[in-house]
């Protein structure tokens, strides 16, 4: 497969677990400057093989471009991990085409901006991993407005996707992976489309995430 399976599943799992809290939050779609009319299954690749979705091009379009597309109700968190620091965020509510949901994302790493943010933000200790995280206040978001978006993950909140829906919109997946923890199935299934840069995740609670990353 041309897509790094480990990368897309790792990012998807982080966003998927973290996103569960978003489903219970009240929805209020903010004013959007440049709303995308593309449904979540319409994607393409640029000449450089970067994912194009919702009018954005990953690794090129910036956080500011994403704000213009998805609205300004955005939150950023900086995570310290074994593989290095990572800035992740989400739009609590947005609309793409006729669909309403949350939009999670990661940014291309910029060590200088991340170091500045860590100096000014208050760290929190992750209970399980022991790693530090920094929930960035709105005034620190400006540090990252020009940073390119690395990945996106759309979390629809008003529709239920089935395996047949996934295959009908994206085609037959190259691989289907059942997520396991401690050798036990979690009920979460990944439908991988490496040539498209797409990972569709369905869980046993009928929740779904469509993740987009450049192949």
Region spans (language model):
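Positively charged n-region of N-terminal signal peptides that target proteins for export
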Residues: 1-6
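Short low-complexity stretches enriched in small and charged residues
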Residues: 21-23, 45-47, 153-159
